[in-house]
Each structure stands twice: as C-alpha cells, then as structure tokens.
Amino acid sequence: MRKIFLILSLSFFINSFSQTAVFNSLLKTHVDSKGNVNYKAFKKDEAKLQTYLDYLAKTSPKKNWPANKTKAFWVNAYNAYTIKLILDNYPLKSILKIKKKGKDAWNIKFAKVGNKTYTLNHIEHKILRKQFNDPKIHVGVNCASGSCPQLGNFAFTEDNYESKTTDLMEKFINDPKRNKISEKKIHLSKIFEWFEGDFTKNGSLIDFLNKYSKTKISNKAKISHLQYDWNLNGK
C-alpha cells in the first residue's frame, strides 16, 4: 500500500512539474522581457495552453503544501485563465470590453480548478489575498492591462516564487510608466490606493515602497495616484 502511495505521489509530482513547464514555455515564447504579450502568436498555441488548463481543472492544492507552492499554483492559474479569456475574445483593445451576461471579466465564472469553477476575483481576493498576508501577490497576478505590473515571462514555482515576485515588485515600483517617484512627491499606481491595506500591515505605505524603491522617499512625501491604463498589455 505504501509503495502504491509513493508511486502515485511521484506520478503527481512529475505531472505537476511537466504541466507547469508547458505554461512556462508558453510565457517564455509569447511574453517579452517588459511583459508585453504577443496575443496574436499566442492564439496559435491555444492547444498547448489548453493542456495546462486541463491539468488545472483536475488538480487541487493539497492542505500540506508549503505556502509558496500554493501561491505559485493559484497565481499561475489566475494568469493562465486571464490569457485564455483574452484569447477567446481576441482581437480586442482592453479587458474591460469583455462582458458576459452583464458581468465583467473578473466576475465571469469560468476558471476550472480541481473540479470547481471560479471567477478571477474569487481566486485573487477570496483565495490568494484572504489566505496569505503577501502584498507581492499584486505583482504576481496580471490583469492584462498597461498599468498592471508586468507579466513575467515565466511560470511561478515553489522555488522561484519569492525571488521572482521580489524582482517584479522592484521593477513595478521603479517603472516610471507605472509609478513616478521622487524624494518629496510620489505619483503611484492605483493599485496602492485600491489595496493600500495589503501594503501597510507592517508599517506605512512609504515604508513598504522604500524596501524596493531606488529613490529614498521622505516620510512626508506628498502622495497622489496616476490614471490607470486599461489598454491591452500587448498586441
């Protein structure tokens, strides 16, 4: 019996690794170093994406998984299903154009994971944000829009989650298209307004920003927020 359990566990691990590798390969092929997505070319690889989505549809994170493994799984699922949604409606100029029965892209129930069907909002807010005190989730999940933190051209894994999200947070905060930072004035992404509480659980917002900002921000800096660019993050 123990041998059977070990064989099944090994088989699951190998399948999980190979399917994540499929998604990783797709992102590496169709997403450039700045997070721009070639959706036109990605469209031709829908069959490969579907193999990964089929894996997600029958896989549930285990309760004994380490936190980073669980976060990587759900962030990958969010991003894969967001890409699927864009491809299903391609060509389009913005994810805001997607509507189904009066619901926007984030409230359409279509993302199948472990024999359940979720909305993107449920994955982000009810699973990732609710279960984990991790503000870097906001640079992991990607909303397919210009002002979103850039989409990484890789899949997340248990081993790379911390380093990759740290790198993405540094790029996001120091990207002048998404955040304009000086010592005494900061014009921030709306993400820091919408989800301010996620970034201030262990100090002020400026404390958080200074962990990643190349420019030291004064505690008395004036804060404003930039208009959000909802144009598609690619072509």
Which residues does each PLM region occupy?
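Interaction/scaffold regions that mediate signaling and macromolecular assembly across diverse proteins
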Residues: 20-235
